[in-house]
């Protein structure tokens, strides 16, 4: 909630089974469905109103930024089934990646090392290391110096 300091949130997630590294800042309004299915590395920044829908494991590497309003969703329903049964796959966001404002990461996706998912993107397939997903296209980017 609004009265829970950002540096206290990692501690609370650990109590409920998350693995959270050192130097992690979690802003207000972040939602985590199943804390025991969330792992966050060191020195990460999780922006306001980020939503981890983690029916399956979500692993966030170190030095990752997940910007405001992003949704990281490891499960959904099989629309081809009359009963809409649930189907889920794990998600990995590797070290140094940046998931920008209002991006949506779907089940089974890996975001590569030091890669960028641009604002508003819907990530349906994995993004390789040192790449940028922008307007649905994956472009190579230089490694950080």
Pin down the residues of each PLM region.
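Left-handed beta-helix
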Residues: 22, 27-28, 33-34, 41-42, ...
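A short acidic, helix-capping loop that chelates divalent metal ions and anchors anionic groups
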Residues: 79-82
